[in-house]
Amino acid sequence: MGLYGIYGSHTTEACPLNNAETRKLVLEHGPKIVEEASKQNIKIINQYHSGLEHTFLWVVEANDAHLIQSFFATNVGKSNALKIVPLITYSDVIEQCKKLEHF
């Protein structure tokens, strides 16, 4: 499985704290989103949100980014602009650097 960062943002108007329709989606899907993602072979590792910036970062594992794209199109993606980015851990970066330096 690959590691991905999902960077999202929404307008102040689309914020679930300000928008009843978005809030309804959050309340409907939020409590069960980890389970729903798991059914699509997506493991949600962490979910971070910045209320002041109206942005979020979720870290997930999945076999490919298209699974994530499809899942979010029916969920959080309805009211957010999304960017799905492949990630590696910092320890992976260190290991790659060691290989380049023949450690």
Give residue ranges: language-model regions.
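Short S/T/G/P-rich N-terminal loop/turn motif that feeds into the first structured element of a domain
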Residues: 1-54, 63-66, 92-103
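An amphipathic, aromatic/His-enriched active-site/gating alpha helix that lines ligand/cofactor pockets
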Residues: 61-93
